[in-house]
Amino acid sequence: MGKIIAITNQKGGVGKTTTSVNLGACLAYIGKRVLLVDIDPQGNATSGLGIEKADVEQCVYDILVDDADVIDIIKATTVENLDVIPATIQLAGAEIELVPTISREVRLKRALEAVKQNYDYIIIDCPPSLGLLTINALTASDSVVIPVQCEYYALEGLSQLLNTVRLVQKHLNTDLMIEGVLLTMLDARTNLGIQVIEEVKKYFRDKVYKTVIPRNVRLSEAPSHGKPIILYDPRSRGAEVYLDLAKEVAANG
């Protein structure tokens, strides 16, 4: 049975989608069967894997709102072993449409149960908010990876996220746990980055991954080419660190 991991932080611009795409691709690269679920209305994980959103006829919206069969929505990607459930801007209306729906928080969980046995890992790219889409992701997941940018105010807003995780644990998913905290966008030339690492480690202790994602030009270029870094530039520092992260995640089971 596949392990379901939500990549979430309600703060935007912390490397959430970059991590979802590249962790998923690197897990696939080391031989794991991976499904990436894009549950962010911006659909950046979808386009980051080379899928034209304009060509997507059905997406995760249809699963959440219309109970579409998840098997019909899954698309293969250019990465061997990596499939995706795409998102389009249509998803932006889903939170409002789900409000009157019975069991609205568990719709993604129910859908993924039908395909969980087909994958080693299911990675969910969450939107930068703590609304119903993120609640669906947390309810469906075994664990959470929290990307934290190595910048000033890095920990700002995390107490709200952790409180949401606790509420989901209490009411919807008692088994949900923090998988790990990932430090992203490190500029090793600055003292600030080092200070943030120390602060985050002090707060989260052994939950902080050994792998730290640096700022990397090739990593930021890859999405515009519709490729994860392992395909776009496999020899880059960005590919190297996400491969290290994939191995860390795989070692955790």
Swiss-Prot record:
UniProt binding sites for ATP: K11, G12, G13, V14, G15, K16, T17, T18, P214, N216
InterPro entries linked to this entry: AAA_dom, DNA_Partitioning_ATPase, P-loop_NTPase
Disulfide bonds: none
Result when mutating K16A: Does not bind ATP, decreases replication initiation, loss of septal location, increased interaction with DnaA. Decreased DnaA oligomerization
EC number: 3.6.4.-
Effect of G12V: Does not dimerize, decreases replication initiation, wild-type localization which no longer depends on Spo0J, 2.6% anucleate cells, nearly 40% of cells have only 1 oriC region, severely inhibits growth on overexpression, increased interaction with DnaA
SUPFAM superfamilies: P-loop containing nucleoside triphosphate hydrolases
Residues that bind Mg(2+): T17
Protein name: Sporulation initiation inhibitor protein Soj
The species this protein was found in: Bacillus subtilis (strain 168)
Lineage: Bacteria, Bacillati, Bacillota, Bacilli, Bacillales
Gene: soj
